[in-house]
């Protein structure tokens, strides 16, 4: 619910007169594009051909947004962008926490005429605020040219702070993260605030978002009053023999001689059946994201043998089902799916 929460915050900010909203949406393009899409769908209402979201039609919608970035173009990709000229509409920017787009936004703000700039009321939302924004190089370093110690900051931290400085005093900065530990340890007092802008330490508040009624998280999976995992409806203990076989499967030399464990096969069938149930519920459910994670080792390279083994299994099942179970292993596969179906 993190994105939904700050989408609502953007809407409330616009209602209260904030006219420039900047979302710092992580370090990579895929997250930025995903966030841009969500905000166009759920905030601006410009994605009209969707099954979900809000849909704004007609001229009577008085708070129409001025969308600066697009799904395809981050801020630094935009050509011939004029300085801010009209603040009657709330402006929306979704950008990566990279040096180039942050520099371009500061240049764009600095190029705005002073009589308009003084009326900017900006909300900066830092998504994944513990990733990229933290000053990981904070401290003094020796400068051999000047023969003295100088403070230095990591590049993204510097650019985020310069962005806040360019908008000062008319801005609010709100960070969102599931893991705020690093943010708590940010130095609240910096010596270079005048030149680089304020510290990103959460001076004013740190709050936990309220869980929705249908939320399933750590408190539901591992409740405090639960004596063991055996009491949980969400956890199935992997048999020790299966766990040993999974560990063997990451070894290329032993892969061909190691079958996929029964518990993993059952989990894959359960996943396929659950997906079939969702698809049968209609297009709206079938189009939703649906994934399964198989996690044996922490590195991608060591997981590749298991990926190949699982893909071979799925390809074999697909051919068997396409032949309407007429292949030699057809009756056995059908019986296995039926067994899992009746179990779950």
Predicted segment positions?
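Conserved helicase motor "Helicase C" RecA-like lobe of SF1/SF2 P-loop NTPases
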Residues: 302-318
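Conserved nucleotide-binding/hydrolysis micro-motifs of P-loop NTPases
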Residues: 28-31, 98-101, 130-131, 179-183, ...
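Motif I (Walker A/P-loop) of helicase-class P-loop NTPases
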Residues: 3-11
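Conserved strand-helix element at the start of the C-terminal RecA-like helicase core
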Residues: 287-306
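Conserved RecA-like ASCE ATPase "motif II neighborhood" in helicase/translocase motors
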Residues: 68-125, 133-163
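Conserved nucleic-acid-binding Ia/Ib motif block in the N-terminal RecA-like helicase ATPase lobe
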Residues: 36, 41-86, 90-92
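Conserved P-loop NTPase catalytic core
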Residues: 57-58, 120-126, 130, 135-281, ...
């Amino acid at each position: 619910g993190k994105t939904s929460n700050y989408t609502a915050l953007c809407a409330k900010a616009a209602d209260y007169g904030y006219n420039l909203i900047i979302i710092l949406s992580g370090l990579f393009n895929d997250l930025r594009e995903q966030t841009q899409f969500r905000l166009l769908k759920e905030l601006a209402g410009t994605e009209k051909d969707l099954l979900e979201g809000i849909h704004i039609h007609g001229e009577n919608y008085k708070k129409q947004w001025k969308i600066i970035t697009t799904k395809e173009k981050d801020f630094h990709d935009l050509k011939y962008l004029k300085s801010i000229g009209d603040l009657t509409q709330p402006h929306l920017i979704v950008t990566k926490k990279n040096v180039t787009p942050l520099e371009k936004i500061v240049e764009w703000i600095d190029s705005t005429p002073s009589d308009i700039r003084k009326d900017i009321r900006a909300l900066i939302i830092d998504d994944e605020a513990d990733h990229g924004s933290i000053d990981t190089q904070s401290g003094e370093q020796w400068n051999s040219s000047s023969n003295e110690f100088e403070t230095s900051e990591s590049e993204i931290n510097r650019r985020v702070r310069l962005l806040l400085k360019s908008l000062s005093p008319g801005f609010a900065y709100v960070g969102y993260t599931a893991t705020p530990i690093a943010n708590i340890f940010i130095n609240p007092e910096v010596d270079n605030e005048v030149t680089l802008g304020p510290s990103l330490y959460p001076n004013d508040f740190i709050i936990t978002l309220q869980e929705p009624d249908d939320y399933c998280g750590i408190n539901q999976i591992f409740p405090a009053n639960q004596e063991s995992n055996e009491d949980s409806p969400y956890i199935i203990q992997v048999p020790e023999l299966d766990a040993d076989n999974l560990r063997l499967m990451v070894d290329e030399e032993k892969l061909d001689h190691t079958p996929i464990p029964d518990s993993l096969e059952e989990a894959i069938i359960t996943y396929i059946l659950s997906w079939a149930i969702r698809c049968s519920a209609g297009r709206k459910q079938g189009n939703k994201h649906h994934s399964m994670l198989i996690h044996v080792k922490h590195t991608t390279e060591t997981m590749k043998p298991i990926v190949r083994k699982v893909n071979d299994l799925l390809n074999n099942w697909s051919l068997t089902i396409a032949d309407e179970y007429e292949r030699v292993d057809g009756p056995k596969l059908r019986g296995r799916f039926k067994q899992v179906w009746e179990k779950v």
